[in-house]
């Protein structure tokens, strides 16, 4: 059985207003040692991404690496000069997707982490760092604590009109509550 490794990367999120539930960031950044002693090399994902494309599929989007908690789908995965840039869409029709979205908007969760199998890796004898030359990417998770501190969600899109409406309703409810005393009756 193949062994899967989990590693996380991070980058701060900024809310956006176009499509609710859509977010982007770096699932992995090249040349950055994570807290497990791994550094992903440029090009490490190329073969895996091509294999996913040839099958017409994408890696899973999970919540905290829990295979029983898929929360959305990856709409864009590409290597650039920085790392593995991803864009995804949370499923806002399911509880877990809504909860993940609220965490992203609040900034309480903004880490990204990859689940992968190392196909080719080289260990630096002096530093002990393992350089990942090629990996099979299995999944990318939203996580609280990424192994790679530079693997973060960069943007979160939300419906400002929707959140503005809820804010106005909340403000109105507070004004009503402040203006009217609450009475409790007993029989």
List the predicted regions and their residue ranges:
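Terminal, non-catalytic protein-protein interaction segments that mediate quaternary/complex assembly
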Residues: 2-4
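Residue microenvironments linked to proteolytic maturation
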Residues: 6-24, 59, 75-176, 181, ...
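N-terminal "first-domain core" detector
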Residues: 20-46
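Small/polar-rich, solvent-exposed N-terminal microdomains that initiate assembly or binding
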Residues: 39-66
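Flexible loop/turn segments at secondary-structure boundaries
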Residues: 32-34, 68-70, 121-123
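A surface-exposed loop-and-adjacent beta-strand signature within N-terminal beta-sandwich domains
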Residues: 63-72, 77
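Pocket-edge structural micro-motifs
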Residues: 27-29, 63-65, 88
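Glycine-rich loop at the start of a catalytic domain that most often binds anionic cofactors/ligands
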Residues: 39-42, 74-78
């Amino acid at each position: 059985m193949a062994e899967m490794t989990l590693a996380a990367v991070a980058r701060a999120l900024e809310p956006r207003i176009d499509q609710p539930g859509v977010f982007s960031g770096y699932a992995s950044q090249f040349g950055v040692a994570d807290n497990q002693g791994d550094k992903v090399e440029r090009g490490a994902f190329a073969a895996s991404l091509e294999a996913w494309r040839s099958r017409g599929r994408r890696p899973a989007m999970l919540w905290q690496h829990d295979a029983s908690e898929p929360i959305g789908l990856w709409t864009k995965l590409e290597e650039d000069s920085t790392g593995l840039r991803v864009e995804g869409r949370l499923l806002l029709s399911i509880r877990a997707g809504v909860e993940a979205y609220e965490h992203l908007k609040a900034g309480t969760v903004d880490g990204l982490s990859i689940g992968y199998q190392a196909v080719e890796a080289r260990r630096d004898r002096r530093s002990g760092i393992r350089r990942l030359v090629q990996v099979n990417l299995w999944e990318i998770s939203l996580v609280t604590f990424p192994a790679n501190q530079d693997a973060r969600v960069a943007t979160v899109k939300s419906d400002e009109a929707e959140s503005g409406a809820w804010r106005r309703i909340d403000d109105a409810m507070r004004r009503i509550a402040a203006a009217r005393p609450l009475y409790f009756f007993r029989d």
